[in-house]
């Protein structure tokens, strides 16, 4: 199947118009006229992922994170972005990314995470433009739910970090896959007992937790960014297989979390 026809199908699943203003998803590398028979799905485009695409005979990588997330001002092979781009191009591997335009769709990244964690009765948290999903679980202690989350997600160095009383009982959970501290003020005003997201910074998390301790607001759970978004790959694979029968879709086996180990103190 021609890449340009695949892109048309991708855009029907993940409309480019739904991306955040700052985001740059879409075709990163490749030519629309090239033939694609096998697609590798991944969270990131790293050297290992490109090598996996080559070894599995994949002509296209569909990643969640754009290959040039922070922009690129040169692609010399002395730098990792240039070296990775050159490796992919030399082996005829194209790269396409679906980022924020995939986050908030039905079956998208955040919904996939909420479903994986066992949340039911999913709705959009008001005031967050549908970015944060609210759901319910049978009443459970914060500690036991954190343990459940740890079992549901792939193992990573950071584990599952939690701020709150371990014995607190929770039933309403707000979720945002990826970096979510910009939504802390909105979640604080909600009926959630717990907010699960990634990349929480020291000061926003500290202020939120102190306020919650006074007001009875939500507890916090910080899960690894890669682990939170990895669960979407199986959902994306199923959607693509239902839409496109002529192409084989496989999920990457590479863990692209940047951290390799932690020393517990």
Residues covered by each model-derived region:
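Hydrophobic structural segments
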Residues: 1-265
């Amino acid at each position: 199947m021609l890449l340009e026809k695949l892109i048309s199908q991708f855009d029907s699943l993940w409309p480019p118009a739904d991306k955040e203003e700052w985001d740059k998803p879409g075709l990163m590398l490749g030519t629309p006229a090239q033939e694609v028979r096998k697609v590798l799905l991944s969270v990131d485009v790293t050297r290992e992922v490109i090598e996996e695409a080559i070894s599995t005979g994949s002509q296209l990588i569909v990643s969640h994170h754009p290959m040039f997330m922070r922009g690129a001002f040169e692609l010399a092979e002395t730098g990792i972005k240039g070296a990775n781009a050159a490796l992919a191009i030399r082996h005829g591997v194209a790269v396409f990314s679906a980022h924020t335009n995939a986050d908030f769709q039905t079956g998208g990244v955040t919904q996939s995470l909420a479903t994986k964690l066992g949340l039911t009765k999913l709705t959009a948290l008001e005031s967050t433009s549908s970015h944060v999903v609210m759901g319910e679980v049978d009443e459970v202690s914060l500690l036991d739910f954190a343990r459940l989350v740890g079992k549901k997600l792939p193992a990573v160095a950071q584990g599952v970090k939690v701020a709150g009383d371990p014995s607190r009982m929770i039933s309403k959970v707000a979720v945002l896959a990826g970096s979510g501290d910009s939504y802390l003020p909105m979640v604080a005003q909600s009926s959630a007992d717990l907010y699960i997201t990634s990349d929480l910074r020291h000061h926003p998390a500290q202020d939120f937790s102190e306020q919650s301790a006074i007001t009875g607001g939500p507890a916090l759970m910080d899960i690894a960014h890669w682990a939170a978004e990895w669960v979407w790959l199986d959902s994306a694979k199923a959607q693509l297989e239902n839409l496109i029968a002529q192409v084989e879709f496989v999920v990457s086996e590479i863990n692209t979390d940047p951290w390799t180990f932690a020393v517990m103190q």
